[in-house]
Structure formats: structure tokens, C-alpha cells
Amino acid sequence: THLFSSAASDVYKRQVSLEGETPDYVAIAREAAAEIGYTSHDIGMDATTPALCDVLVYVTTQSAYINQGVDRDSVESQGAGDQGLMFGFACDETEAYDELKGRFFPLPAALSQRLSRRLRIVREENILPWARPDGKTQVTVAYNEDGSVLGVDTVVVAIQHDKHLKDQFGGSIDAELEHVRQSIIEHVVEVTIPQELLLPNYKLIVNGTGRFADPGGP
């Protein structure tokens, strides 16, 4: 969704300037946070309610030191406004598995992304009604000496959950954590990572630092 106020355009010497086209930064920020799932103060933030969530906008003009190399009369003499360094690579590690074909992506990153997407699905479809928006994933893949994939060695998942979940287990935090762990195995890991990739003694770490209950959030 693009939220803009009214705008005017000036055309001069084959150059177009847009004036007055100001994004509604506050609305965009609220919409993005709400789409992620932060719609309740109880779980960390209610982005939809101004009384409970304020959005501060700090948008300023470009640094004068950078601007002096950008705004030039001659297009040929204009410099870059900033520099960026990007790196990455394509590979065929994902292409041996039907669920991952077409990605041409490093296997650990591809599997981590699939886990993250699955965390959102189990929350939005109420498969795990106690799940909350804040979640993180990491996958460690073991390789043979020739560089071929041996299998998944470690899966790390952190998932925020309902603070009342322990009440289902007589207040036991240990039982609560084991329930979260088994649920992640059944509904996230085993339906996301191809079974042939999971090494027999792979390590699964769920909420490794302990309880991760409400409130969480950004």
C-alpha cells in the first residue's frame, strides 16, 4: 500500500521534479507493524492504536557534505550520494530437493527462510494458537570434505508465546518449554526441512535462553 498526499509535478529542461509528494510515514509504519501481527498491547505492541503506540518521524535533509557531490548543474559531473557494498552468490545446493528447487540459494539460508515463513503460517492459521509474531531461525548445515551437503546438523528456533501457556501445565515452565519444543518439531521443522536432510542426531534448540513469553515485540 502506498500512502501519499497530493502532489504537483514540474517539468523543466527534460527533468521532472515531484513536489509535495510526501509519504504518510506514520500510516506506513503502523500498517507494516500490524501486518506482521503486532495488534495487541498484551503481546508487545498495538500498532493500530495511537494511544498505545506512538510513531516518531525523523526524516531530515541529506547531509550537506554528501549533497555537495550530488547536486551539480551537469549530470555528467554528479557523484554518488552514498556507497554500498553487497556480496552474495548463487549455487545449486537447493536444486537436489523438490521443496527447494528453483531457489539456487545457499542451503542454510534457504532452510532458515522456510522455517521463518512457517512460523508465520502456524500463527496466522491458528495451528499454534499460543504463537506470537516475534521469531527467529537459524540452520547449520554440515558438509563433506568435497563440499557436498552432508545434512542439517543444528536447527535453532526462537518463538515468542502466550504468557498464559504455562497454565495448561500447572504453571510448570519446564513442561511449557517441552510443549513448545515438540510443537515446533511437529508443525514447523518436520514439515519444512526435507527429512532426508535431517541428520540422525541433529540438534534442535528451541528458545535456548529459556522462556520467551509475552510481551515481546520489536
Question: Where are the regions that the model predicts?
Answer:
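Single conserved hydrophobic/aromatic residue that forms the stacking wall/gate
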Residues: 1-8, 12
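Short glycine/threonine-rich beta-strand-turn micro-motifs
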Residues: 10-22, 151-153
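Short glycine/threonine-rich loop-to-helix capping motif typified by GTGT followed
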Residues: 16-23, 210-218
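Active-site-surrounding "flap" and adjacent substrate/cofactor-binding loops of secreted or lumenal enzymes
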Residues: 21-33
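Glycine-rich, mobile lid/loop segments that gate access to catalytic sites or pores
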Residues: 34-38, 42-217
